[in-house]
UniProtKB/Swiss-Prot annotation:
Protein name in the entry: Histidine decarboxylase
NCBIfam families with a match to the protein in the record: PRK02769.1
Protein family per UniProt: Belongs to the group II decarboxylase family.
Organism: Raoultella planticola (Klebsiella planticola)
Modified residues (N6-(pyridoxal phosphate)lysine): K233
Amino acid sequence: MTLSISDQNKLDSFWSYCVKNQYFNIGYPESADFDYTILERFMRFSINNCGDWGEYCNYLLNSFDFEKEVMEYFAQLFKIPFEESWGYVTNGGTEGNMFGCYLGREIFPNGTLYYSKDTHYSVAKIVKLLRIKSTLVESQPNGEMDYADLIKKIKRDNEKHPIIFANIGTTVRGAIDNIAIIQQSISELGIERKDYYLHADAALSGMILPFVDNPQPFNFADGIDSIGVSGHKMIGSPIPCGIVVAKKKNVDRISVEIDYISAHDKTISGSRNGHTPLMMWEAIRSHSWEEWRRRIERSLNMAQYAVDRFQSAGIDAWRNKNSITVVFPCPSEAVWKKHCLATSGDIAHLIATAHHLDSSKIDALIDDVIADLKKQAA
């Protein structure tokens, strides 16, 4: 069976559209400069990573060996001994966050999840799906959690086992919650570290902070219990995916033996994409530490360039420390639609992902924003 000429033409038209718009993205955190051509031959196979990559699986076409090496890499990156960790390649950041919240709920079934107003919208869905108690915490103007409000609400709830959802780079403002302050503040309430759970959503910044000179606290050495990072954001992937890493002793609590695949399952989803672990493996094996560092540095420099250009025109643009997200006043609908910007209330942002090898798209956006805001002020 073959496609009709009409259907083939439809695919050809979509191909041309994708080629034309491959590097369009300036408003969302996805890097488009990836090349997984070497993996194209594997697309003829149904590769399924159901279950635990650390065990034998009766489904032979899996990429477990590659997934294991991916997890070794991220355990090292996030400062936890590999043998004390467990995680997997997820379908994206939301699944990683759900996994972290699920672990927290299983450890503290009656605990309350605390997350800030700047937290990704998916967490509200996770709260409903897990049927977990939750409390919304105020945010500071820069997008960081309001730590005083967090403590006030833990005290108000008389919560003895809080489950903390910390943002390591918020979606809109790129803010990083200070997990050192969070832990110190909870300690001052008389709650011991073993009596609460701390998950870190590092969807974008999880591949930035390990490669900068002065990172904010974010990893296991700094006190977290689990962390999620996206694969299609700073790394880049044609298929949305992510990586979640947690403490093995906590994951063992949710392990279930599945007889018909002859394996244990600890994951959220059953069947899992076996191609994305190959992509993440190729990405980490083909980039040295220094190459990642230069890639991140270039993006941070481009973000600062955008801030400087905005500010030189009298526009109140800014970014958080170690963030490639540049926040500025929301322009008119015509401008934000033209440049496919993400907007929230009275602000918009651009994200200086790694495929911006020069400033041309950023300059074009800034020129339009400057002209637009002048027009609005006239």
